[in-house]
Structure formats: structure tokens, C-alpha cells
């Protein structure tokens, strides 16, 4: 019985990256032998055990065989005769198929260390093609390690997997899980570049895939291409370490530009409402969590209004605040402003340009929040006892007055 550290922990240590979790594989053992040494069995699909002291997970070395389409269509085999190399060969990439012995030496049967030095993602064996999740994993790794490239033969294999329909067998929850993890990496644009290169993006997120090649007005978007713009936006969001809902909104806010008819290019009048419909469609299909969906919907609908904030009247600004439910959910409104800022700065040459609209609308919200709705409601009831509809009107008007007064000190000076 021999124990090895395997996978990402070995890779990250060789890269000089902080190791967060360690995976262990045990060679030459049986479930009975593990239990006899005090390990607690916890695995459902294959034998995994908790260490009696550290509670770290230890898996018995295993092989696997493809039995059905998709990432769940596998049968696992494990016994004391399975070797370390047999366990490692089932892994996705050479850089993830290394092991570390108890004495610290590296076991590298597939050239993972060399591929680390070359900064290449290369599949271990043709069995890579049996699990479509591996396409998403490579794309996610590209977002984490943006200096890496996909080996030509691996990209060809991924293209073949897409053509064979393997990607279509992925369950929506798993697609979103991997996309969300990739969005939270250091350069999420690399994830989508890899997915586009192999054709997978067209299958899992066609609403985004069509944005490449769709032009925008050069005076506002020097990068011109809408797909390029979205990549700049999500990378800016990553650079400011935005939370996942903001990054999701940054990714999806301009989907409507993909349905603008070519004879209307490069203008995209009314794209906001098209974006709202498409965000809703994508959210339902991928089962995107409510917090991400709601912020993406709001950003798709309102990012143009945020961009024009300095030109808006106080009444229009209060309408915006009320439409966004900013008084009940102010933090979500602030996140929408942050996503809109990412949209503004995610343009070639705009990363360091001022975006006063964010502070302007935050000041408007703060001013409107000073209005005592309960007090106004009571006064209105006393004055108009049989006209309840006047209460929201009175509160709205008080907010308009408060916003107009507060923003006179801000650039833009909205009118009442």
C-alpha cells in the first residue's frame, strides 16, 4: 500500500502557486485494508476514504470505462492491482497527470512537467474525448493560466468531440458551474477564446458566440467588434475582483446586439430589450442562479440609461431608482452600476477614463433615501383620506425634489 499526492496540487507546487487542496490516491490497497487502518468510507461512485486524523480524502487507484454519452457515462474499476500509471492515464491533461511520492519525488509518466515549462495544455490519451466536461475544464484552466495555450492536437480532438455531439450531452447545471468558475478566474476572456476555437461556444452559448463579427460605432467602441468588447468587459470585471453576479452581468448585458439586422449596423437601437429577452432565455436554459440572473437582466435593461445619467432629469433618475427597486435592494443597484462601469471601461483605450455616472447615481440614491416615506404617507392620508393613490405619487415627488437639490452640486445639474 502506497500513498501519492496527485493532480492539481502537484501542478501548482511546480508552478509556485499556493496549493489550496491536496488529492491523495492509494495504490495497492483494498477497501477492507483502508477500514482496518481507521479510514472512514465516504465515496458513493468509487472508494473514497477520510483519513482518521486529518479527515483528508484518499481515493483508491482506479480505472474507468466509457459506457454512455455525457460526463456521467462511466464505469469505474478499482482493486489492489491497479497501478499508479493506470490511475494517472485516465486524467485529462498531462499537467494534471503527475503524482508526488511520500519522499517528495515526482512521478511523471506523460510529460506533464515539460508541458508546464512549455505552458501547454495537452491531453493525456484519446480517452480525453470520452468526457465533454474536459472541454469546459481546459477552457477554465485557460482563464486561470492565461499564458498557456492548447496543443494543436488537443484542440483538434476537442473539435471532433463537438462535432460528435458530446458537448450536447452536458447537463445545463454543469455548464453553468464551469462557466461561473471560469468567470471568477484572472482572465475569463481566455475561457471563451478556447471554447470558440473548438466550436463549443456555439453549442453551449450561441447567443454569445454570434457577437463576434458584429460591429459597433467606432467613435464609442474603438474595438468595434462586439465580441471583443464583451471580452474586454469581463476582463475588466475580473481586474477589479468583482463578485460573480457582476461578472455574469458583464458577460450577458449586450446579447441583444447579436440579433440586430445587418442593415442597421453599426447602430443597435433597441438592443437593450432584445438583451433582456435573451438573458432570460439563457438563464432558464443554463439554470443560472437568481442573483446572477436578476442583475444581468437589470444591467441589460438599464446600462444605456446609466451611461446617459448626467443628461437625465431628476424625475427620470427617480424613475430609474424605483424601476430597479433600489430602495429595497440598494446593494443590487450598486452592483448594476459596477457592471455598467465595466461596460464603459471595457473598450479599447477606456480602462482609465472617468466614469462619473456611477458616483452621480449613487449620490442620487443617497438623496432619495433621505425621504421619509412613512411620514409622507401619513400626511397624505390626512390631507386626502379617500385618495390612497396619492401616497406613492407624493413619495415619488419628494424623492424627485431631494434628488434635484442634491445633484445641483454634481456635474450634470438635473432639472426637476
Swiss-Prot record:
Gene3D superfamilies: Beta Polymerase, domain 2, cca-adding enzyme, domain 2
Family: Belongs to the tRNA nucleotidyltransferase/poly(A) polymerase family. Bacterial CCA-adding enzyme type 1 subfamily.
Family matches, as PROSITE patterns: HD
Miscellaneous field: A single active site specifically recognizes both ATP and CTP and is responsible for their addition.
Protein name: Multifunctional CCA protein
Record field: catalytic activity: a tRNA precursor + 2 CTP + ATP = a tRNA with a 3' CCA end + 3 diphosphate; a tRNA with a 3' CCA end + 2 CTP + ATP = a tRNA with a 3' CCACCA end + 3 diphosphate
UniProt keyword Magnesium present: yes
GO biological process, one term: tRNA 3'-terminal CCA addition
EC number(s) stated in the UniProt entry for this protein: 2.7.7.72, 3.1.3.-, 3.1.4.-
Function: Catalyzes the addition and repair of the essential 3'-terminal CCA sequence in tRNAs without using a nucleic acid template. Adds these three nucleotides in the order of C, C, and A to the tRNA nucleotide-73, using CTP and ATP as substrates and producing inorganic pyrophosphate. tRNA 3'-terminal CCA addition is required both for tRNA processing and repair. Also involved in tRNA surveillance by mediating tandem CCA addition to generate a CCACCA at the 3' terminus of unstable tRNAs. While stable tRNAs receive only 3'-terminal CCA, unstable tRNAs are marked with CCACCA and rapidly degraded.
Binding site for ATP: 8, 11, 91, 137, 140
Subunit structure: Monomer. Can also form homodimers and oligomers.
PANTHER family: MULTIFUNCTIONAL CCA PROTEIN
